[in-house]
Amino acid sequence: MNKQASGKDTGNRGAVTGGKQMDGFADMLTNLLSKVGISNHEVFTSEKPHLPGYFRATKKWDFLVVKTNDRGEKYLLAAVELKSHVGPSFGNNLNNRVEESLGSATDIWIAFREKAFKNSRAPWLGYLMLLEDCPQSTKPVKVDEPHFEVFPEFKNASYAKRYELFCRKIVLERKYTSSCLLMSDKQGGLQGIYKEPANDLKIYPFLYSLLTHVATEAALISSS
């Protein structure tokens, strides 16, 4: 990934347009994980990315890391949601994203508690959102408050700000281990250019957290 002179714009293979815009991020994660000892056959994206759930039979994740030891025992190391949101519809789709991701996190943690993943230690859960940078996503949005006031941080917050708040809160509430928010306009997205609107939601801490966890867990599995 290459930093631009502006400091906030960064290059990546992901684009905000196109049906498979997140494939570049999955490829990047696979490549980086290979440097800490995770082989391609231990990464699951388009094929076999399913995990058992507690409230539902299975959930299809966007990116999984499952390591197998010498005895054939499997360990879940990481599960990642790689999402994008392109306009023009932001309001309802944002709410759907929030509900979906919270449900997935709740489901997997209870499944973990109930030993669905056998001897696995707590997995690393990640959430990455690539949001279209456009007037509709960055302008203030009015909220309906017919009975009670919304929390202050949501007043006049744009959809981009709402995503920022969401990504921050899911880590604060320990639903996900780490989260990342990126923004890109349609032209920049085609060139692999994105912005990082919040310092605590940048991609490098997200990647560092993932790689550190996976490398540590893989080493423990190999030595057991």
Swiss-Prot record:
Organism (species): Geobacillus stearothermophilus (Bacillus stearothermophilus)
Record protein name field: Type II restriction enzyme BstVI
Reaction(s) the record says it catalyses: Endonucleolytic cleavage of DNA to give specific double-stranded fragments with terminal 5'-phosphates
Record keywords, A-Z: Endonuclease, Hydrolase, Nuclease, Restriction system
Record-stated family: Belongs to the XhoI type II restriction endonuclease family.
GO molecular function, one term: type II site-specific deoxyribonuclease activity
Protein's gene: bstVIR
Organism taxonomic ancestry: Bacteria, Bacillati, Bacillota, Bacilli, Bacillales
Protein EC: 3.1.21.4
A Gene Ontology BP annotation from the UniProt entry: DNA restriction-modification system
